[in-house]
Amino acid sequence: MKTLLLTLVVVTIVCLDLAYTRKCYKTHPYKSEPCASGENLCYTKTWCDFRCSQLGKAVELGCAATCPTTKPYEEVTCCSTDDCNRFPNWERPRPRPRGLLSSIMDHP
């Protein structure tokens, strides 16, 4: 009887472990969600677009089976633990002074 009980416990643990899915943050909307079967990596992809100087880099978060390949202007980081791809925490770019205020600040 003890052997049967032990066997059931082992089978349950093995089955639960096989059904595990990675959780990663995803964009649009920004929230943690389970990844599809076979996608065991979380990634963060950043790049500059036409709004980069005002808003900072564009960000894409998601799941992948392999770390995504990058284009020359992109940066990608991959990780393999749950929710390891949080939204990057960087400072928003500050606008440069322009016009009359700029000339007053440049020449005290």
UniProtKB/Swiss-Prot annotation:
**Free-text tissue specificity from the UniProt record:** Expressed by the venom gland.
**Is Iron-sulfur one of the keywords?**
no
Keyword Protein biosynthesis applies: no
Q: Which InterPro entries match?
A: Snake_3FTx, Snake_toxin-like_sf, Snake_toxin_con_site, Toxin_cobra-type
Sorted UniProt keywords: Acetylcholine receptor inhibiting toxin, Disulfide bond, Ion channel impairing toxin, Neurotoxin, Postsynaptic neurotoxin, Secreted, Signal, Toxin
Query: Coiled coil located at which positions?
Result: none
Q: Where is the signal peptide?
A: 1-21
* A Pfam family of this chain: Toxin_cobra-type
GO CC annotation: extracellular region
- The disulfide bonds in this chain are C24-C42, C35-C63, C48-C52, C67-C78, C79-C84
Q: Indicate the principal place this protein occupies in or around the cell.
A: secreted
Cite the GO molecular-function annotations of the record: acetylcholine receptor inhibitor activity; ion channel regulator activity; toxin activity
Q: Where in the cell is it found?
A: Secreted
Query: What functional role does this protein have?
Result: Binds with high affinity to muscular (alpha-1/CHRNA1) and neuronal (alpha-7/CHRNA7) nicotinic acetylcholine receptor (nAChR) and inhibits acetylcholine from binding to the receptor, thereby impairing neuromuscular and neuronal transmission.
The Swiss-Prot or TrEMBL record describes its family as follows: Belongs to the three-finger toxin family. Long-chain subfamily. Type II alpha-neurotoxin sub-subfamily.
Q: What is this protein called?
A: Long neurotoxin 13
Protein source organism: Drysdalia coronoides
Lineage runs: Eukaryota, Metazoa, Chordata, Craniata, Vertebrata
